[in-house]
């Protein structure tokens, strides 16, 4: 596997926008540091290419259906007795939607992952495998995955 290509794929797929990795990254998604100690390679790959297949309650989105029939899905980032605040796109943290509770017909857990499904669409099979090796290595160039 190729370390540089894996690191670049990690950047290109915008992983750090949502995921913590070492001392960098966001906190919207699961921490990817040492994730290979908790999950098998197949599960990691599946989570990258099919993020909605297995959802963690800790990171699930909420779907709010309004009385007028409109639905809004996003991460519930704030709730008061009067309002709900949703973040529909974790890559746009300033685009929060405030909803008055009196306008809400229902609120439920979404079955769709907040991780977009198309983040690796521009990557080749080899780049995806290098990305997987980079994540498994916790970003360490000396990891056995990168030794010839």
Where are these regions (language model features)?
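Post-cleavage N-terminal segment of exported redox proteins
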Residues: 1-2, 21-24, 134-148
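Electrostatic cytochrome c docking/interface patches
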Residues: 1-11, 30-33, 39-43, 67-70, ...
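An acidic site on a long C-lobe helix of protein kinase domains
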Residues: 2, 14, 123-127
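The canonical Cys-X-X-Cys-His
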Residues: 6, 12-22, 32, 131-138
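C-terminal capping alpha-helices of c-type cytochrome domains
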Residues: 70-72, 76-84, 97, 108, ...
